[in-house]
């Protein structure tokens, strides 16, 4: 079987959002013999920031010497992005081999009316591939929620809920507490704590749902006064001229057991991912990585003589962590793809994510802002627009997805919020070209509202010079991109 045929089989499965998938994924995983079940897993849930946190955790662990599998969603451009080993996407021939292996089983399930959903199959493929590649540890990003998510078929050694906000309410519940409780289901078994960056009602609901928690966030003087002081402190000192963030992380002595820093740790780092929320995600990732190291070495204080042969090469200290954070790249999250005009791609897809984007952008100098906005149909569009940065012009658009929102409806939301120059677009590439044409060299073009919109813009820019790790090195002669023909 060729890759293209295998991809069609996978994309032909049910892709509806929020379908309970844990039992279906477990059924398929069992059919495969539960490959990878012996691996130490890190499980990352949350309304926002779970993908960034998963990537940061993976980067720290790789810097420490582990071979790491990373499972994330959605993909921006190619399905193979969702499953990576040591930074490399799953090989196309492996995708073909997996689909060929399960195709008879899929046919049986389809005949019985119990065919798995797309995300079930992708989750099983990730675990199958990680087992084939003989990795040391796997980091899994939850799809939706936690309790019934397909990724919940594994038993993690470390878990986190990055944040809690109103998102996927049709599946997870209408309140912050409902959503937090669903996400807290990723808590590791036994006496290991669940790490969380949630605040307010979300944090309190997680506290009641999990046996033990470790809280992460900004210091109380900078945080919501209703919140207690976090156990682990993350500070964000703003962006540099090079468009990376300055952060510091402080882990007090004794705040967390079963981790490689029981004596405490404080360090500074640069971060390619901008924003105070990313500083918090970096601190969560550091905590998760420390739990993994302690698990694999067998002791939080294991010295070189105590380590087994399989962990002898592991190196974990503040310098290693800072290098892992500094080198992590995560496309589509405040990703700067040009400087003249400043062009930023950010997949913020709910009000809380737009709030974080607005705060981050406020520290970046530019003149006028030109927004390219598209979203899914089930999102709070008016609230997202209200939370967006002050905007001089907007072009709405529709990504190539059945559940994308109507651009005309999005335009009405923009007009109702008081934005004067609003253009109803359709195709993402045309909308992006229009915004770029409007922008002067000292302006900003911001693409946001959905990772699917961001993914289409990244595909449009693929003809430009793009490094293998997702960094972009500018456009020839500083020209604005033109939409590709289809």
Language model regions located:
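C-terminal helical cap/extension that packs against the catalytic core
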Residues: 201-205, 209, 342-343, 382-444
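Acidic, Mg2+-coordinating active-site environments of NTP-dependent enzymes
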Residues: 138-141, 161-264, 268-272, 282-319
């Amino acid at each position: 079987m060729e890759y293209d045929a295998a991809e069609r089989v996978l994309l032909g499965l049910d892709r509806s959002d929020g379908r309970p998938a844990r039992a279906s994924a477990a059924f398929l995983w069992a059919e495969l013999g539960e490959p990878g079940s012996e691996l130490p897993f890190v499980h990352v849930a949350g309304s926002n920031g779970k993908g960034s946190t998963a990537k940061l955790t993976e980067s720290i662990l790789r810097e420490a010497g582990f071979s790491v599998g990373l499972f994330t969603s959605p993909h921006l451009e190619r399905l193979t992005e969702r499953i990576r080993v040591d930074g490399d996407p799953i090989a196309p021939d492996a995708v073909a081999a997996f689909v060929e292996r399960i195709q008879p089983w899929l046919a049986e399930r389809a005949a019985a009316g119990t065919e798995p959903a797309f995300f079930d199959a992708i989750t099983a493929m990730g675990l199958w591939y990680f087992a084939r590649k003989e990795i040391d540890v796997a980091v899994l990003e939850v799809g939706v929620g936690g309790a019934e998510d397909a990724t919940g078929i594994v038993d993690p050694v470390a878990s986190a809920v990055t944040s809690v906000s109103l998102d996927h309410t049709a599946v997870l519940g209408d309140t912050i507490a409902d959503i937090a409780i669903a996400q807290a289901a990723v808590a590791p078994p036994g006496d290991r704590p669940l790490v969380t960056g949630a605040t307010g009602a979300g944090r309190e609901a997680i506290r009641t749902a999990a046996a033990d928690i470790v809280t992460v966030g900004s210091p109380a003087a900078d945080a919501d006064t209703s919140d207690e002081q976090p156990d682990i402190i993350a500070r964000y000192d703003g962006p540099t001229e090079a468009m990376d963030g300055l952060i510091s992380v402080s882990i007090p002595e004794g705040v967390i057991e079963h981790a490689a820093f029981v004596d405490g740790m404080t360090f500074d780092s640069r971060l390619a991912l901008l924003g105070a929320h990313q500083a918090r995600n970096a601190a969560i990732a550091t905590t998760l990585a420390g739990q993994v190291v302690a698990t694999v070495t067998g002791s939080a204080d294991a010295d070189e003589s105590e380590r087994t042969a399989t962990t002898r090469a592991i190196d974990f200290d503040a310098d290693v962590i800072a290098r892992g954070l500094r080198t992590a790249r995560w496309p589509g999250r405040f990703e700067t793809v040009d400087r003249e005009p400043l062009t930023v791609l950010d997949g913020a897809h709910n009000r809380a994510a737009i709030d974080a984007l607005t705060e981050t952008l406020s520290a970046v100098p530019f003149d006028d802002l030109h927004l390219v906005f598209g979203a899914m149909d089930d999102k709070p569009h008016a609230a997202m627009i209200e939370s967006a940065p002050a905007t001089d012009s907007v072009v709405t658009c529709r990504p190539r997805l059945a559940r994308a929102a109507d651009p005309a409806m999005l335009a009405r939301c923009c007009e109702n919020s008081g934005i004067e120059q609003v253009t109803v677009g359709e195709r993402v590439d045309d909308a992006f070209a229009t915004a770029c044409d409007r922008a002067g060299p000292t302006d900003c073009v911001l693409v946001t509202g959905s990772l699917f919109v961001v993914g289409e813009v990244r595909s449009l820019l693929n003809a430009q010079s793009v490094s293998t790790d997702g960094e972009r090195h500018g456009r020839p002669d500083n020209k604005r991109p033109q939409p590709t023909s289809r």
